[in-house]
């Protein structure tokens, strides 16, 4: 077993060796290095063919038509293109948008920008388990609601929303439905032929592909229109200009192909490991799982260890790579806004650790993690006067702390 142990697969994944090998054939003079937009020679044709194959591999995983796949620089750009693109195109029909408070910043900040442009956004609060109440969603829909954006799997707590039911509510209201599926693609069965999803954001590096490339699914029937946010040579049917990075696209395609092939065997394996981790940690006093355990990614476990500061715990866990909050926002000292939206107090939100398992996680690593966690929590609580007070039966909420 090699230390440190990587348990932060929701932040990024290593590139699968098979993917890296495939990508290498599209970089040098001996490889297929052409510009897919070069229509006058073999170098361009070969590159275009490679892009087409990757487009089909991505479409195959999600039950889409390859013509519905638009390549972007990543899921953040896909979210921006979907939300701004649809809002701007359909603004004559209305200016109301619905989203949820636990969405990724790429969705929330894009909605904030649209508010500055005169759009109105309803931010739904999830239930305590992280799920959206469908009745509340239905009640938020209005005749002028042009767009709803709800993520499939949450990046912090791994909770899976019922995108089938939400999509049907949107379709009945003639509202465009965007899903951020960055965390769920390749981990959960998605068949867009059966879902009323109009736009779907995807990433490559969350599924063992390279960083710097992603895709947006744009439905053809019923056709969804977008206003471009990057202008230029009219690539990607005018929706996203810019020379296509063939090696990255090929890598993403190969990663999606592997995921389709191995998903049925890999997800039960990860669920068994995740449950092993949970069973090993749940007996620690004052630990709380964040988010529904029933409707959740098999690879995610988010636990709050009360009376332990999350940052101190992470420092004590030098041999394990985990995160306390989303990788995109963990640079700030604010407690996780996702956990706050579930109703957790600052202390519990600050004491949360996200474990996300992946393709290279082993049983040995999980057992090592359990032992290390138990020791670290015990050690830090031994240093905590709050823990002593709690053990003495003092209700800490009744204490008035003096301000400094």
From Swiss-Prot:
InterPro entries: Aminotrans_V_dom, Aminotrans_V_PyrdxlP_BS, Cys_deSase_IscS, Cysteine_dSase, PyrdxlP-dep_Trfase, PyrdxlP-dep_Trfase_major, PyrdxlP-dep_Trfase_small
Co-factor requirement: pyridoxal 5'-phosphate
Coiled coil: none
Localisation per UniProt entry: Cytoplasm
S-S pairs: none
Entry-annotated residues carrying N6-(pyridoxal phosphate)lysine: 206
Known pathway: Cofactor biosynthesis; iron-sulfur cluster biosynthesis
Catalytic-site annotation from UniProt: 328
SUPFAM superfamilies, sorted: PLP-dependent transferases (SSF53383)
Annotated positions binding [2Fe-2S] cluster: 328
Alphabetized Gene3D superfamilies for the sequence: Aspartate Aminotransferase, domain 1 (3.90.1150.10), Type I PLP-dependent aspartate aminotransferase-like (Major domain) (3.40.640.10)
Superkingdom, natural source: Bacteria
Keywords noted in UniProt: 2Fe-2S, Cytoplasm, Iron, Iron-sulfur, Metal-binding, Pyridoxal phosphate, Transferase
Example GO biological process: [2Fe-2S] cluster assembly
A Pfam entry, by short name: Aminotran_5
UniProt-recorded Gene Ontology molecular function terms: 2 iron, 2 sulfur cluster binding; cysteine desulfurase activity; metal ion binding; pyridoxal phosphate binding
Chain sites annotated for binding pyridoxal 5'-phosphate: 75-76, 155, 183, 203-205, 243
Class in the EC hierarchy, top level: transferase
Record's function text: Master enzyme that delivers sulfur to a number of partners involved in Fe-S cluster assembly, tRNA modification or cofactor biosynthesis. Catalyzes the removal of elemental sulfur atoms from cysteine to produce alanine. Functions as a sulfur delivery protein for Fe-S cluster synthesis onto IscU, an Fe-S scaffold assembly protein, as well as other S acceptor proteins.
PANTHER family (alphabetical): CYSTEINE DESULFURASE, CYSTEINE DESULFURYLASE FAMILY MEMBER
Description of how the protein assembles with itself and partners: Homodimer. Forms a heterotetramer with IscU, interacts with other sulfur acceptors.
Family: Belongs to the class-V pyridoxal-phosphate-dependent aminotransferase family. NifS/IscS subfamily.
Protein known as: Cysteine desulfurase IscS
Organism, scientific name: Haemophilus influenzae (strain ATCC 51907 / DSM 11121 / KW20 / Rd)
Lineage of the species this protein comes from: Bacteria, Pseudomonadati, Pseudomonadota, Gammaproteobacteria, Pasteurellales
